């Protein structure tokens, strides 16, 4: 017997300080060095921090739970991608792409035309995502990650020439 299940609807929404518990919960599931609820609260207290999250309807996730998120800093001339995380059971569904497109479009709408990020040298899926948006390797930070001593690659983006939704 087949059961019809409701179609999952995905929404990418701007997050705020009331989302700190959901953000830190997702971080603890996805990150080796997760941000805490307090770290998110402190970041949201500043005017340069922005975050977007994936929420699903008709999903086993609770309405406040996040399937993924992206956090960035805006400076007058640059958007810095701080973190992007998607629940393991929701990866390979385009959520990372939706989050990145949303964050870059938001930055572009405020007049920002440059992007920067750091990524673990071993994180091939993330590197592929970033390069698909036009990010190019600009350098390397040796021994950057405290947990493993792994190098970080520095990527930059000229959003005057980028595709915000490849």
For the regions a protein language model found, what residue spans apply to each?
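Conserved catalytic-core motifs of GNAT/GCN5-like acyltransferases
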Residues: 118, 136-153
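Acetyl-CoA-dependent GNAT
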Residues: 3-7, 11-89, 100-106, 110, ...
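Acyl-donor (CoA/ACP) binding surface of acyl/acetyltransferases
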Residues: 93, 97, 142, 151-153, ...
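Conserved hydrophobic beta-strand within the GNAT/NAT acetyltransferase core sheet
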Residues: 81, 115-119
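Generic structural signal for helix capping and beta-alpha/helix-loop junctions
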Residues: 44-45, 96, 124, 147
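Conserved glycine-rich acetyl-CoA-binding loop
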Residues: 87-101, 108-110, 120-128, 132-133, ...
């Amino acid at each position: 017997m087949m059961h019809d299940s409701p179609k999952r609807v995905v929404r990418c929404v701007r997050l705020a300080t009331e989302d700190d518990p959901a953000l830190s919960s997702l971080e603890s599931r996805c990150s080796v060095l997760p941000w805490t609820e307090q770290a998110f609260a402190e970041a949201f207290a500043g005017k340069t921090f922005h975050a977007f999250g994936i929420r699903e309807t008709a999903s086993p996730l609770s309405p406040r739970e996040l399937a993924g998120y992206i956090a960035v800093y805006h400076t007058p001339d640059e958007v810095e991608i701080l973190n992007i995380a998607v629940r393991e059971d929701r990866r390979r569904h385009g959520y990372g792409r939706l989050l990145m497109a949303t964050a870059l479009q938001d930055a572009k709408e405020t007049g920002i035309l440059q992007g920067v990020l750091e990524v673990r040298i071993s994180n091939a899926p993330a590197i592929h995502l970033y390069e698909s948006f036009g990010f190019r390797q600009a350098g390397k930070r040796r021994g950057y990650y405290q947990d493993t001593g792994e190098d970080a690659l520095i990527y930059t983006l000229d959003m005057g020439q980028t595709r915000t939704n490849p």
